[in-house]
Amino acid sequence: MSTGPLIAEIAALVAEPARASMLSALVDGRALTAGELAYAARVTPQTASTHLARLTEAGLLSPMREGRHRYFRLVSPNVVEMLDGIVTVALENRPRRRPLSRQERELSAARICYDHLAGRLAVELTEVFTAQEYLVIADEGAEVTEAGACFFGAFGIDLSALSSARRRFCRVCLDWTERRPHLAGALGAALTKRCFDLAWTERMQHSRAVIVTASGKRGFFRTFGITVSEENWSPTGTDGKSRPSRLAAYPSE
């Protein structure tokens, strides 16, 4: 079976600027109304309706109705991977002509990618997990080691429940801002939820960006050895000392 026509069909849909804007607005996993997506794409409701119908027919969007409103969301994380892949290719080797805007810096630092963390914070977490041999990464796949199972369990993540889920348990995505992998799959989503539950992170209003709270800054350093600052995040503390060699401190509710 030739995949060329399939690629061409999806590429043509995504290539239209309004449809691309609608898809981008849904990358954080939320469901938005047709009106909200029309606003995001800067088109009239009538034009938005036509675009949404085409994206739904192509299997990229899943519609749902709540009362008087009709909501749309991306049909699966695979659509997010496709969009992030396009961005990665578009940015690769492109010379930077201007400094990053504040919004771009916020997204680069930490953001939501469908249902899991992305950006510099997510990449550093993944590097900690591999350095401590909690994860073994090969290509786009990842496997939790015995030590990792103990760690994630102590951190408050039920791995047995994740393993029985219908989605892929553990994998990695290439982060389009950092050009390094970050944790995804059911485990990546559970880790993200745990950080929100601990109030270490908060969603930024009207943005995919994620804010690290004051307790989160303490927690990420104590548990993972990651220093979160306004300027940058580095694998060393502000005093220049290296991160802890063992992640022995676990959070409490």
Regions found by a protein language model. Name each.
Residues 64-89, 144, 148-151, 216:
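Basic, amphipathic "hinge/linker" alpha-helix immediately C-terminal to the N-terminal HTH DNA-binding motif
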Residues 6-44, 70-72, 112-113:
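N-terminal helix-turn-helix DNA-binding core of bacterial DNA-binding proteins
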Residues 34-61:
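Canonical helix-turn-helix DNA-binding module
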Residues 13-19, 76-77, 107, 119:
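Short helix-coil-helix linker/hinge
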Residues 1-5, 28, 80-137, 155-206, ...:
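Amphipathic alpha-helical dimerization/coiled-coil segments
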Residues 56-66, 70-73, 138-139, 204-205:
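Beta-hairpin "wing" of winged helix-turn-helix
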Residues 133, 137-149:
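A contiguous pocket-lining binding segment that forms or flanks enzyme active sites
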